[in-house]
Regions:
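Short, amphipathic alpha-helical "recognition" segments used to contact nucleic acids or chromatin
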Residues: 3-18
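Short alpha-helical "recognition helix" segments of helix-turn-helix
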Residues: 22-25
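Long amphipathic alpha-helical segments with strong coiled-coil/leucine-zipper propensity
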Residues: 93, 99-233
Length: 295
């Protein structure tokens, strides 16, 4: 029997919400015919054009060099408390991200015998006196935790090196993926800070060649946006992403993770693991994603 284009489209539409056997039953076709249509469509395997667009450039060993470690900051009298001022200076040294200086700073901090909680109380009291209100004292939380600061500083330095190794002088230029988002949503007006989700979905779905075909594609793109933000943020605390990029990221998370059926248990498990690790796990849209994974 020769299949019509309408039958093929019906099979593809049904497959997005049903198993292969259910599609065969609903479409009145043999399981073999359904599998053939799905395979030939290419819509249920990873989209190579999508992957190419949403992939960071490779690390270049011969790329730009990391900015030199800043000179040691001068030791200054800030609070008048010698131990507190010493810690403030050591925190600046650790903030350079240089492993050698960090090790030296932590060694020097070990010679301060006052308990860390006492140091934080004294620093908090000074902050309150300077700021004129109790909330100012919150700035002392974790003040004496040099190990945590050292870990963050080393991670930031590593991210800076990766950012320069991948992008060089083009770090702040819009990537192809960002340019695509800007162009796709050009002319849309925001409503209460965000673009209307329905119109965002319509605009992006108008470019099927750059749509994710699988949940794995979705996870790949979400990781791309996370990594791009991580690398740029390490180089500038003032960096923030385009509103259009944020809308694309939301669209992939809230819409596509809920629409694209998992191809197998491994893909469903990977998506669930992403949800559990995500800061968005409490969003109301997560229920639809869970229904998609276990439905």
């Amino acid at each position: 029997m020769r299949l019509t284009n309408e039958q093929r489209e019906q099979v593809i539409t049904l497959r997005r919400k049903h198993s292969l056997s259910e599609v065969a039953s609903l479409a009145g076709l043999s399981l073999g015919s359904v599998k053939s249509i799905i395979s030939r469509s290419g819509l249920f395997t990873d989209n190579p054009r999508h992957r190419a667009m949403f992939t960071l450039p490779p690390l270049q060993s011969s790329g730009e060099t990391l900015p030199a470690v800043p000179e040691l900051p001068p030791q200054e009298v800030v609070t008048g408390d010698k131990e507190i001022d010493a810690l403030l200076w050591l925190r600046q040294v650790i903030g350079t991200g240089d492993p050698v200086r960090i090790a030296q700073a932590k060694e020097a901090a070990g010679r301060i015998t006052t308990p860390s909680d006492e140091l934080e109380k004294r620093y908090g009291k000074w902050l309150v006196g300077k700021g004129g209100h109790v909330l100012a004292g919150l700035g002392s939380i974790g003040f004496a935790n040099l190990d945590g600061l050292a870990k963050r500083s080393i991670e930031r330095r590593a991210n800076e090196a990766e950012a320069i190794g991948r992008f060089g002088d083009a770090l702040w230029d819009d990537t192809q993926a960002e340019a695509f988002c800007l162009e796709s949503l050009r002319g849309l007006e925001t409503e209460t800070w965000d673009y209307p989700p329905e119109l965002v979905a319509e605009r992006f779905k108008a470019h099927p060649e750059l749509m994710p075909h699988t949940l794995s594609d979705c996870l790949h793109e979400l990781a791309y946006w996370d990594d791009l933000y991580r690398l740029r943020r390490a180089c500038s605390k003032d960096y923030d992403t385009h509103q259009e990029v944020w809308s694309r990221d939301q669209f992939i998370f809230t819409v596509m993770l809920a629409e694209l059926r998992p191809r197998n248990r491994d893909e469903a498990r990977a998506t669930l693991r992403h949800l559990l690790d995500s800061e968005r796990r409490d969003w109301k849209e997560v229920d639809r994603i869970l229904d998609n994974l276990i439905g």
